[in-house]
Regions:
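Short loop/edge segments at beta-strand edges and connector loops
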Residues: 46, 154-156
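Short, well-ordered alpha-helix to beta-strand connector turns
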Residues: 70, 109, 130-131, 161
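Short beta-strand and adjoining strand-loop segment in the mid-core
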Residues: 122-136
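An amphipathic alpha-helical interaction segment
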Residues: 137-140, 146, 151, 159-211
Length: 318
């Protein structure tokens, strides 16, 4: 399978390397299977013969025209953590060759894959419109505001939709590369994951910091603070809206617009986050922790913890 990996100035070093390393490992381990899949023939392409990564390393590339021969185009992330600078880059002249390459690959029916901030380049090129996608959890409010036509689910680690596969934050590149291997051979993907000591991570929820998301909107940030001060109490949305000086409808819309979820779900996320913190840092029983975060029955909290983190309570203990 011919794979073209798009490199550009400022590309995230670990993202670029992860794709190569996982696919190289898969190639090295193919013969360990009775029925190995075809090898992955990986080529790094770019608008310039040499690009400088985010960490300052120089990477040689082949011309962008090689994408015409590719059976898969992979777009690693940009090493940029500032939302304003990220948007400026993916919408600016520096990324125009990359956007064109992505759009042409999509028009030709070539599958495309990307992770973390690289998903912004795909969205800017228009290939995610009307489709499901994920991105870095902490950039979800920015992504959702700029690309409203994309059905964003930042809780997922890997999302595939209409020939485009997206993955979550930073080291989600490993999950993305494993999904590429898994598409051809689940057995080989399992083997590679074991050798690289990589756990399956279907969700980003366990890594999400609710306050980092809420801070993108003043109303949501105020609601978060209001809820955190009352985690052990029943939460009333009308009371919260009254205390914050907004209508209940305005509060609901602000939460939905910023977080892509309901106020009730956000309150649950805050309670689960605090419960997980107490499990890691204290010796309190689950019953005591449940009461501290507003649940009468520990079984309810147990189910929510497993749902949000994908882990049993025992594994969350420090």
């Amino acid at each position: 399978m011919k794979v073209a990996v798009l490199a550009y100035d400022g590309v995230f070093d670990s993202g670029l390397a992860a794709v190569h390393d996982v696919l190289d490992t898969a190639n090295a381990m193919r013969d360990m299977l009775d029925r190995p899949p075809p090898a992955w023939d990986v080529t790094t392409i770019g608008a310039k013969r040499r690009v400088r990564t985010g960490a300052g390393h120089v990477v040689a590339t082949e011309p962008l025209r090689h994408v015409a021969d590719a059976e898969l185009l992979v777009v690693p992330a940009l090493a940029e953590r500032r939302p304003d600078e990220l948007i400026a880059y993916v919408s600016g002249p520096g990324s125009e060759p990359g956007r064109r390459t992505v759009a042409r690959a999509c028009a030709a029916g070539t599958p495309i894959a990307s992770a973390c901030t690289g998903t912004f380049l795909l969205a800017e090129a228009g290939v995610l419109d009307g489709h499901r996608a994920t991105t870095s959890w902490w950039l979800a409010p920015v992504f959702r505001a700029r690309y409203p036509d994309v059905e964003l689910d930042q809780t997922r680690m890997v999302v595939g939709s209409a020939g485009v596969t997206t993955a979550g934050a930073a080291f989600g590149h490993v999950d993305l590369a494993l999904s590429i291997v898994r598409h051809r051979s689940p057995a080989l993907a399992e083997l590679v994951a074991r050798y690289l000591v990589v756990d399956e991570r279907p969700s980003q929820s366990a890594y999400t910091i609710a306050s980092a998301l809420a801070g993108h909107d003043p109303t949501v940030a105020a609601f978060e603070s209001w809820v955190r001060a009352r985690l052990a109490e029943p939460i009333s949305l009308p009371a919260a809206a009254h205390d914050l000086g907004v209508s209940e409808r305005t509060l609901q819309r602000a939460v939905r617009r910023t977080l892509g979820t309901s106020p009730v779900r956000f309150v649950q996320d805050l309670r689960v986050e605090q419960a997980a913190h107490l499990l890691r840092t204290t010796g309190l029983s689950l019953e005591s922790i449940a009461r501290k975060v507003g649940y009468e029955h520990p079984g309810t909290l147990r189910e929510l913890l497993r749902d949000r983190t994908g882990k049993p309570v025992a594994s969350l203990r420090g």
